[in-house]
């Protein structure tokens, strides 16, 4: 439904996006993820029209958006913060985009959306009287009020504290799914990208690195950057034991029957799982971010099983 | 050694202060500086003076009254002189010289102050716009023929307050009110000083203005080619409104004798000549000579019927009247 | 165990002195209640004949000036904050420099410029435009014109501060929601400007009511000129007192109105986006630049040129020994008042250092600072009455001390608010630490506290210095005779229409004013906010 072809965007003297290509299908939740400065916000801005591309095509439902002004594109956007009109109440903020609707119809729509996020009781409050999470909820339903074809979210959860972030993300995902909305979320948070979306676009240095489902990204990273960014394994460097092939990407699993011996060099506990960095002794080879429920100690010897190996050059 | 020099300094200053007078005057410094110096040279009495606005000077004298540092209060306009005396700030002075040199209508009825020079508040016309021989008077200017032709100084200046006080004293409150009302009804242009009134008349903005004679003298001296001329008003009736600059001895002054002598000197031949000359005014002493410029304005009939003491008495009424008719 | 701790003594002293500070106002009420016999005639005249006109004039002036200032300030704020107009840094300075001109200086410049024999009307007459050429400038519209040019920054700055905080993303959000620029303007931008604009308008109202010098030049009767007239011509202290009470009521009303309005400001989060909202096409850009140019011309360039031209004509005659004594008096007064305010402010701020949580502090502190909210004429009458009652005789005996005390009372707030915010940042633990090390209180004050505040103290001194140099009504009323300052001399000269002679001194004051305005804008302080 949204097709981006050979998009290149310049900001000042720098080329921020180069030959970006992807196709977003309707009703899908997409994450646009990458490190800071990789151009993801610029990509969003090009889609919505805040920025004019150097070359390339942005098409919505087959129509070239290049000459359509922002007001007419029917694309909604939710920013990271500071998004609500400070002098208008919650209700007035939501009504803003649908002010031309007939009153009854408009009121119903607003009520419906307020109920969706459980903020009906706060409808007369001003933005500064709301908490961070409440503000973002309002920002989201405000953007949804005029029934846009596409919703863009620019780091919309990034300014919230972790617990709230997680909760809100789930809530919003449910809402978007129930409304069958197509949504692109820009985030620098890998977990967020993996958990929120149907598909992930990985961006680095203005270029698309990979576009696929979360499990594809995680299990079959297309290149070194994607692999390292999602921390899901390692390319074998040098001096590797015979079972491992040089220059290849290896997917490993901790197992008692494992063939390769490693030492725990780093240990992180997150979300109920332990994530270990395991190093093959006397070697530069290191497997990062290997998940396991078992609690190993640092320096402990752990056996790993080779699951898969492939070379980026093949794919 | 230190104490000796201190003692000698104190002695010296005490001696130096032996013969001196202090004058508070609202006259501009350059108008009185030389006269004071002349007196000093002649008599050895030093004149210390402070200049300021009449109202402020009066407040200061009031404050010092129990133990005044000042001996003489010198100011312009009978209104100010009357106010000082009515507040009890001036002594009644017995002096034959003063009573003979200063006509009765130009000094306080109780001799608390004496006029020292005379100025007339006269009408001045644009010679291109007003024919010679036109009958002109303060009352005449209220008539509709003069609509759009009159320029006046602001009512806030004491000279105009005394002029209106004179009208009240001469005609009574109601008639005076209708006269001033007539001025205002003639769309009079208001200016902040007499010189600007004269300039406006010369430029043709209006045909006639009312100013003090010495302002006319000063301007005409600088720019003799201006189409301006004095046309003495009220020559067929009571005469031109005159006012004085004058002085009185401050009550409880510590140098009453010297102060009296100084006043007498100011009212006598030599001082009168200088006094009148420096500001192109008329001397109070009839026998003192006028400057040539002043003489060139010709003889005129002054209003001698109105005692200037009353100008002060009626000042408040005059302010009220001007405010009522909207004379700004 | 001490029954009365040091802290309590400190609190009670502060309260005591703050009541003392309120005495001038208290005496205004005491003396104004009953009118002395000799003043009754004057007062009846004033009350019945003068006051209705004053009310009408004041009302007219305030409304017209507010309208004029807003018409300049609101578009200017939009142009400067929301568009990509070139040379923004230049305009930032030129739109705030008009504050350097005392209103009475702007007044006589324009009265002289637009008088019948002046350049503009003469030109019109010679060109054949008789109605234009005979236009009268000395009316409410003329005064409002001058006030608008001199006071619009008080509305401009608060609006700009609010607009600065409007995130560019809000505009983007509005567009993404399908709404036009006009809709965004109407629904978000303009409503956000209303609170700062109204707050600025009340400040303009206060300045208009308090002005004495400018309305005097225009021969326009207001409360301040009537107070002065009662004081100096009618010699009716009773009338002056009662007029002061009336004006006091209006001033306090406006003051509380401003506080009330400011509280309604919706809190805005600071934003860092630098992007200009509206990128103007050529024609609107030209229009905006022209508007900026016209405002700058009339509020800044023309006045300066006129002052310089007049000064040039007059300087040979004016620059006599007399002038140097005027400058000397002005500087001496400014210096001594600056010094006394500095010392008193420091004492006050030190006394307040541990009291900020106390609920009574804001109220009693305002007693010390109320002088700034009141017109100079009122403060003069109040201080005069205070000392008349203390001394039993005319306060004029106090000489220079009277006017120094009056000016200190008037401008104490300027010193206090320059020092207080920074002093509050000093951690109270410093003093405790110093005491625990066995050092006396004075050691702490001179080695730690004062050095910390050195920069602010210098600024406080400078700001007060300039305010005193420019001040006119209070100095006029309370100074000893013969002791003229530049401002009082300008009053005397302009009341006689002597524009040229007044220009030289005025130029000096304007340059002085400009240096502080520039200093303030460099320091980032907002003059309008602290008023």
Q: What function would you assign to each model-found segment?
A:
Chain B
Residues 79-83, 202, 207-227:
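A ligand-binding cleft/hinge motif common to bilobed small-molecule-binding domains
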Residues 245-305:
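Mature extracytoplasmic/periplasmic domains
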Residues 12-18:
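Sec/Tat signal peptide C-region and signal peptidase I cleavage site
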Residues 18-82, 328:
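Early extracytoplasmic/lumenal segment of secretory-pathway proteins
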Residues 3-12:
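Sec-dependent N-terminal signal peptides
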Residues 292-328:
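Extracellular/periplasmic bilobal clamshell ligand-binding domains
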Residues 26, 30-33, 69-205, 238:
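Extracytoplasmic ligand-binding site segments that recognize negatively charged/polar headgroups
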Residues 214-248:
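A beta-strand-loop signature enriched in Asp, Gly, Thr, and Trp
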């Amino acid at each position: 439904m949204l097709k981006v072809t050979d998009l290149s965007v310049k900001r000042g003297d720098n080329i921020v996006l180069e030959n970006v290509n992807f196709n977003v299908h309707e009703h899908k939740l997409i994450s646009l993820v990458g490190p800071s400065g990789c151009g993801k916000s610029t990509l969003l801005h090009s889609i919505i029209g805040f920025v004019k591309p150097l070359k390339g095509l942005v098409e919505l439902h087959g129509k070239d958006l290049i000459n359509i002004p922002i007001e007419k594109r029917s694309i909604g956007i939710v920013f990271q913060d500071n998004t609500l009109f400070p002098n208008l109440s919650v209700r007035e903020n939501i009504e803003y985009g649908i002010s031309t609707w007939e009153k009854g119809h408009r009121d119903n729509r607003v009520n419906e959306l307020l109920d969706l996020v459980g903020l009906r009781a706060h409808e007369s409050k001003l933005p500064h009287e709301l908490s961070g999470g409440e503000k973002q909820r309002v920002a989201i339903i405000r953007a949804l009020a005029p029934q846009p074809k596409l919703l863009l979210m620019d780091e919309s959860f990034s300014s919230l504290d972790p617990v709230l972030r997680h909760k809100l993300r789930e809530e919003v995902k449910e809402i978007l799914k129930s409304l069958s909305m197509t949504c692109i979320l820009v985030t620098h948070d890998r977990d967020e990208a993996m958990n929120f979306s149907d598909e992930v676009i990985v961006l680095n240095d203005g270029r698309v690195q990979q576009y696929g489902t979360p499990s594809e990204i995680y299990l079959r990273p297309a290149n070194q950057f994607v692999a390292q960014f999602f921390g899901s394994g390692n390319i074998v460097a040098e001096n590797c034991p015979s079972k491992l092939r040089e220059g290849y990407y290896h997917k490993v699993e901790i197992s008692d029957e494992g063939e390769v011996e490693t030492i725990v060099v780093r240990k992180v506990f997150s979300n109920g799982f332990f994530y270990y960095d395991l190093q093959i002794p006397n070697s530069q080879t290191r497997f990062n971010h290997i998940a396991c429920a078992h609690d190993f100690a640092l320096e402990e010897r752990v056996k790993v099983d080779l699951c898969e190996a492939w070379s980026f050059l093949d794919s | 050694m230190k104490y000796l020099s201190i003692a000698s300094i104190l002695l010296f200053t005490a001696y130096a202060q032996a013969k001196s007078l202090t004058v508070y005057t609202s006259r501009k410094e350059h108008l009185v500086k030389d006269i004071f110096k002349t007196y000093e040279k002649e008599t050895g009495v030093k004149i210390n003076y402070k200049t300021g606005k009449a109202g402020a000077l009066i407040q200061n004298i009031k404050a010092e009254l129990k133990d005044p540092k000042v001996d003489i209060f010198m100011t312009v306009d009978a209104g100010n002189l009357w106010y000082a005396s009515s507040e009890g700030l001036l002594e009644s002075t017995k002096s034959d010289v003063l009573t003979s040199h200063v006509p009765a209508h130009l000094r306080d009825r109780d001799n608390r102050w004496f006029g020292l020079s005379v100025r007339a508040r006269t009408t001045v016309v644009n010679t291109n716009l007003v024919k010679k021989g036109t009958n002109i008077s303060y009352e005449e200017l209220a008539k509709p023929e003069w609509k759009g032709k009159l320029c006046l100084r602001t009512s806030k200046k004491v000279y105009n307050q005394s002029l209106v006080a004179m009208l009240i004293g001469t005609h009574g409150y109601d008639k005076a009110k209708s006269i001033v009302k007539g001025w205002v009804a003639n769309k009079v242009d208001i200016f902040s000083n007499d010189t600007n009134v004269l300039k406006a008349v010369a430029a043709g903005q209006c045909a006639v203005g009312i100013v003090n004679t010495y302002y006319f003298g000063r301007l005409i001296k600088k720019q003799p080619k201006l189409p301006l001329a004095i046309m003495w008003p009220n020559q067929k009736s009571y005469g031109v409104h005159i006012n004085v600059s004058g002085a009185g001895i401050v009550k409880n002054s510590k140098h009453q004798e010297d102060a009296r002598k100084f006043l007498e000197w100011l009212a006598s031949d030599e001082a009168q000549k200088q006094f009148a000359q420096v500001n192109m005014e008329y001397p109070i002493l009839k026998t003192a000579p006028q400057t040539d410029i002043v003489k060139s304005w010709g003889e005129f009939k002054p209003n001698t019927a109105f005692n200037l003491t009353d100008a002060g008495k009626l000042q408040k009424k005059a302010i009220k009247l001007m405010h009522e008719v909207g004379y700004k | 165990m001490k029954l009365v701790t040091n802290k309590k003594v400190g609190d009670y002293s502060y309260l005591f002195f703050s009541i003392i500070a309120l005495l001038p106002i208290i005496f205004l009420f005491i003396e104004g209640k009953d009118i002395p016999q000799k003043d009754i005639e004057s007062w009846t005249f004033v009350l019945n004949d003068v006051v209705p006109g004053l009310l009408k004039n004041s009302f007219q002036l305030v409304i017209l000036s507010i309208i004029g200032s807003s018409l300049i300030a609101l578009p200017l704020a939009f142009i400067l904050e929301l568009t990509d107009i070139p040379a923004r840094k230049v305009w930032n300075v030129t739109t705030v420099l008009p504050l350097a001109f005392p209103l009475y200086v702007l007044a006589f410049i324009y009265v002289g410029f637009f008088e019948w024999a002046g350049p503009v009307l003469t030109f019109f007459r010679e060109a054949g435009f008789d109605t234009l050429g005979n236009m009268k400038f000395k009316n409410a519209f003329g005064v409002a014109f001058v006030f608008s040019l001199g006071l619009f920054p008080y509305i401009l700055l608060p609006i700009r501060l609010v607009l600065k905080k409007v995130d560019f993303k809000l505009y983007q959000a509005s567009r993404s929601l399908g709404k036009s620029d006009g809709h965004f303007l109407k629904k978000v931008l303009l409503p956000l400007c209303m609170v700062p604009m109204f707050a600025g308008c009340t400040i303009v109202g206060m300045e208009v009511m308090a002005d004495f010098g400018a309305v005097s030049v225009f021969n326009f009767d207001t409360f301040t000129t009537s107070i002065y007239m009662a004081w100096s011509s009618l010699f009716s202290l009773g009338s002056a007192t009662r007029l002061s009470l009336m004006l006091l009521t209006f001033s306090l009303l406006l003051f509380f109105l401003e506080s009330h309005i400011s509280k309604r400001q919706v809190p805005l989060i600071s934003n860092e986006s630098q992007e200009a909202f509206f990128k103007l096409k050529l024609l609107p850009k030209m229009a905006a630049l022209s508007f900026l140019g016209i405002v700058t011309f009339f509020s800044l360039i023309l006045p300066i040129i006129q002052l310089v031209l007049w000064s040039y004509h007059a300087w040979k005659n004016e620059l006599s020994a007399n002038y140097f004594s005027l400058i000397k008096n002005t500087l001496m007064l400014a210096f001594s008042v600056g010094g006394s305010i500095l010392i008193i402010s420091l004492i006050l701020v030190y006394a307040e250092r541990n009291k900020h949580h106390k609920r009574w502090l804001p109220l009693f502190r305002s007693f010390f600072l109320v002088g700034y909210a009141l017109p100079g004429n009122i403060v003069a009458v109040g201080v005069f009455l205070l000392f008349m009652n203390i001394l039993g005789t005319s306060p004029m005996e106090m000489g220079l001390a009277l006017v120094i005390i009056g000016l200190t009372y008037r401008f104490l707030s300027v010193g206090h608010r320059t020092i207080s915010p920074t002093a509050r940042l000093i951690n109270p633990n410093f003093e405790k630490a110093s005491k625990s090390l066995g050092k006396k209180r004075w050691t702490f004050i001179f080695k730690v506290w004062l050095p910390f505040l050195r920069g602010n103290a210098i600024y406080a001194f400078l700001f007060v210095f300039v305010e005193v140099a420019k001040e006119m009504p209070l100095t006029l009323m309370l100074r000893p005779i013969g002791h003229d300052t530049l401002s009082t001399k300008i009053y005397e000269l302009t009341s006689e229409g002597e524009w040229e002679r007044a220009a030289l001194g005025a130029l000096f004051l304007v340059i002085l004013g400009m240096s502080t305005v520039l200093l303030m804008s460099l320091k980032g302080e907002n003059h309008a906010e602290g008023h």
